[in-house]
Amino acid sequence: MTYDLTDDGTGKKYDSGKSMVGTLCRVFPRALLGIGKCITFGTKKYPNPKNWSLVEDGLNRYTDSLMRHLLKMFAGQEVDPETNLPHIFHVCWNALAIAEFYLMKHKEIDEELFK
């Protein structure tokens, strides 16, 4: 990669091709707030915010949880009775947990994300 070092009086930011994480907040603010409510409920139930990552056989158990919430949603139950939150937020939270477990297992992909 080469950089243009000339000063033309305009600001430059060489971030082409890098992850646009901030865009998530602008594009999906309500969905992220809903997922955040799931996290808030979880930290009240399990005080250690990293508890989810310590669960034995977490990948399979969170996959099962995702599927349970998805099936309940498709069966017509929109809101989880325990949390009073829509099942779709739990589906998304579980998908994020599954993605993290995947990255823990595949360190080469994890390292590539942070380049």
Identify the residue ranges that each predicted region occupies.
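Intrinsically disordered, low-complexity regulatory regions
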Residues: 1-115
